[in-house]
Amino acid sequence: AARAEFTVLHLVTGAHAVRALLPWLHAADRLPALRHYAGAAAAAWATLPREHNGAPLQVTVLPWTEITARATLSDDDHVIKLVDACRELEASQGGAVWSRAASRAVAEIA
């Protein structure tokens, strides 16, 4: 489980990094950069364990103020990086998946 969490952490923070860096690349380099990231992300995703029943894990989605407050209490800098990346990705792309992932990351921190 720890290996899977490590992989997911880097998929999310990698997506955040690509989004942040794309505007700085020459236009001709953007599509190749996305293709390279997509290939790496697909390879990493393929290594992750799958739930047998296909049902999503239950998680209480917290408001961002609570998520960030809990993240700052963590002694694991990976939690803070993941929460920051999720917050930035939700702000730029929308979708509740980011707050759901961040809520799961801080679920054990109170």
Region spans (language model):
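Mature, well-folded catalytic/scaffold domains that follow N-terminal targeting or propeptide regions
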Residues: 1-110
